[in-house]
């Protein structure tokens, strides 16, 4: 599924009635011109997310496929200024991206794409979404949204806010 190789490992017996513990380490490489960091956003960049947020309490995260194809396409065709996945919830990961980029942020709570049955609080805080959080130059947004709708018609891409100068914006 992910073209990965198992390079080693060790198994041992787990005492009856105990839970198994599995630990995995992964490494990778990326060409410099394909590298997008969370620390390279700029004031004025539009903040976008893929998919819908929230729902881990209802086990949505157990049936999720990482956005590898989508992020590869995005970097190859539009080169975001900053990007990361949302693993700890938007309320934790958006401030991390903004702080790493020496920015503040504004967020439009009304447009947050949410899983069915999820409120704004769940969309912000559930975690385990593994959707992409993207910062894009404003001049690219309309073209990106049109191309995205053609390439990934079953996956939403929603503008949810923007990066602003450090010290401005909101706090989550």
PLM features: what roles do these ranges have?
Residues 1-172:
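Helix-biased detector of long, well-ordered alpha-helical tracts
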């Amino acid at each position: 599924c992910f073209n990965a190789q198992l390079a080693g490992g060790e198994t041992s017996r787990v005492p009856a009635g105990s839970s198994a513990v599995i630990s995995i380490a992964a490494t990778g490489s990326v060409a410099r011109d394909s590298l997008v960091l969370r620390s390279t956003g700029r004031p004025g960049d539009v903040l976008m997310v893929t998919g819908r947020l929230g729902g881990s309490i209802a086990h949505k995260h157990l049936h999720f496929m990482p956005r590898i194809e989508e992020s590869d396409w995005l970097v190859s065709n539009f080169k975001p200024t900053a990007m990361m996945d949302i693993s700890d919830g938007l309320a934790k990961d958006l401030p991390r991206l903004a702080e790493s980029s020496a920015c503040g942020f504004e967020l439009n709570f009304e447009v947050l794409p949410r899983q069915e049955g999820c409120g704004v609080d769940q969309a912000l805080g559930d975690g385990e979404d593994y959707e992409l959080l993207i910062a894009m130059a404003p001049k690219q947004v309309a073209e990106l949204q049109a191309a995205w709708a053609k390439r990934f018609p079953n996956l939403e891409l929603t503008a949810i806010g923007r990066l602003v100068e450090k010290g401005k914006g909101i706090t989550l």
